[in-house]
Amino acid sequence: MSKRLRSSDVCADCNGPDPSWASVNRGTFICDECCSVHRSLGRHISQVRHLKHTAWPPTLLQMVETLYNNGANSIWEHSLLDPASIMSGRRKANPQDKVHPNKAEFIRAKYQMLAFVHRLPCREDDSVTAKDLSKQLHSSVRTGNLETCLRLLSLGAQANFFHPEKGSTPLHVASKAGQILQAELLAVYGADPGTQDSSGKTPVDYARQGGHHELAERLIEIQYELTDRLAFYLCGRKPDHKSGQHFLIPQRADSLDLSELAKAAKKKLQSLSNHLFEELAMDVYDEVDRRETDAVWLATQNHSTLVTETTVVPFLPVNPEYSSTRNQGRQKLARFNAHEFATLVIDILSDAKRRQQGSPLSRSKDNVELILRTVSTQHSTESQDNDQPDYDSVASDEDTDVETRASKANRQKLQTLQSENSSLRRQATASACQVQTGSDHKDTASHSSLKRRPSARGSRPMSMYETGSGQKPYLPMGEASHPEESRTRLQPFPTHIGRSALVTSSSSLPSFPSTLSWSRDESARRASRLEKQNSTPESDYDNTACDPEPDDTGSTRKGRQRSMLWQGDGLLPDTAEPHSVPSPTLPSTEDVIRKTEQITKNIQELLRAAQENKHDSYIPCSERIHVAVTEMAALFPKKPKSDTVRTSLRLLTSSAYRLQSECRKALPGDSSLPTDVQLVTQQVIQCAYDIAKAAKQLVTITTKENSS
């Protein structure tokens, strides 16, 4: 490896001199121009920080410096180091290249599609590979070799992996060994400082026992990173965790009484389920980061040279792991003015503290308010068109650039769905083979689930910094912890797409505190209810008790989420019909696989039509998909016993219905308003993605149940 690649004096992406930004989760330093592209990709791809004008925890900066100086960039450019790559015409961007399209395309290929990372040979059971990698990570973190651990994480090792024999996670091992930089890296990829091992001890406990007090204090800071960041955004101060102060809630500058509208909005915020409240808080965190990074960006740029090529980030970039509804809600946060956004942040801090402490709702006059006039206005103006996907046009002078990014986002979603569809086909085939051979992993799965006891923070939210897998505890193939989580990330990926769904998880996740007074029985009881929570609606973070479609985030949350076991969560109602008699009967695996193959075949036809811009083919394709979905749903009882089956069936059927509705919009209508075909295509792909995911869940469930 050349010294040039190891030097922190050059940009990791174009070799330009004097990089002033860092990509924390990638362990690289980047220049201003390349940073503009990183920002446009979103924090789920790259977490950027300015090296001088951003407040850094010292050990976090030291971790990034150590990684880059030891060649972490070669992980993301592995195949480019091969002399054969020169013959193939692939090359790295140069400082003289234009940002668009040269640098932008290279950076997207490098980090978003992972086109140059080392790929392990595909195996029949890729979950075994992930488990082996996670065990290697478990052993490696006791040493100081950061690059080895980042390489393992990039290959699919799980930062929250619970070692079945050792009874601990990698963060327990790193904390016991006093490896503070390893702990920083694991936290970036989703490791949970609040997870308990088989002895009931957390990484903080081991750090204190070993006399590693700096590490113990840092782990506590990581636990409260989300609320600390929000408080710092408002008042420039953080709570003093050493003295036991874990929340700092700034006071309002004025003494105005809450309006009736503000009181109603605040009450609605307080009535959100913990799951939806977590998602809203994480989205607000992302918006805080966007605004702070914008301020640093504008203060540090030489506008005379960069104004023509700088990528504008007027709102949060689309995260393909999230549903279109949630992405819309996230982008609407950019419409809040400074006062409105500050009061929203204050109320989130107040309610986070209340939920953690288990305090009842106060009827006294509060000193904070939630001003959502913007959203209220939007609701009144959008009520006539609620079915239209609304990616808000936040003010931007670079419409062409935004359209280009949207087009590329569509292509990325197409590739992701193709990967998912291919994965679904492989799973159906593998399941068929499993049924024929009668393979049985019941004992292994049950043992793993027993060892991986519910903890206060079983997995991290995937919002802020990650794309998906790293924040979740390791789950063996076919073992689904949440309906949203069942998009198995431990399967081989086709050669035409990067392993982004597997290895781009980069979670330095700001998270809620995990030191909550929940008993083990309560934790276990909540774990059994998580599937029901996942079916709560997320439209503008509403909390109505209807039969909503589940969030398609696919990751923990990121079930994907690091659980914030709030006080009183045990009172959440079951969404199932109270007087229905559930049926335990599930269809045969062979029947489910046969119908799944019909669905995947029809989805593939729709994808081809989307790629070739054959919009007139959308409707017939969607009708065939709807027929196949209806036939598959008819195989299952009307009132399944399993919550997971009910949720998956809801997602399957509702997505097929939405797909038909979206496909109709692709045809030119009589309306004088032009059809945004690009946006329609994005929604069509999203619906097809949801259908494929739901079908995969049902294949997994029936295979597991029928083989047990």
Swiss-Prot record:
Stretches forming ANK repeats: 132-161, 166-195, 199-228
Positions of C4-type zinc fingers: 11-34
Biased composition (Low complexity): 504-518
Composition skew (Acidic residues), residue ranges: 384-401
GO biological process: behavioral response to pain; brain development; presynaptic modulation of chemical synaptic transmission; regulation of ARF protein signal transduction; regulation of synaptic vesicle exocytosis
One GO MF term: GTPase activator activity
Residues modified as Phosphothreonine: 400, 536
UniProt modification remark: Tyrosine phosphorylated when coexpressed in cells with PTK2/FAK1 and SRC.
A Pfam family of this chain: GIT_SHD
Domain Arf-GAP intervals: 1-124
Any one of the GO CC terms: presynapse
SUPFAM superfamilies for the chain: Ankyrin repeat (SSF48403), ArfGap/RecO-like zinc finger (SSF57863)
PANTHER family: ARF GTPASE-ACTIVATING PROTEIN GIT2, G PROTEIN-COUPLED RECEPTOR KINASE INTERACTING ARFGAP
Function: GTPase-activating protein for ADP ribosylation factor family members, including ARF1.
Protein name: ARF GTPase-activating protein GIT2
Organism: Mus musculus (Mouse)
Lineage: Eukaryota, Metazoa, Chordata, Craniata, Vertebrata
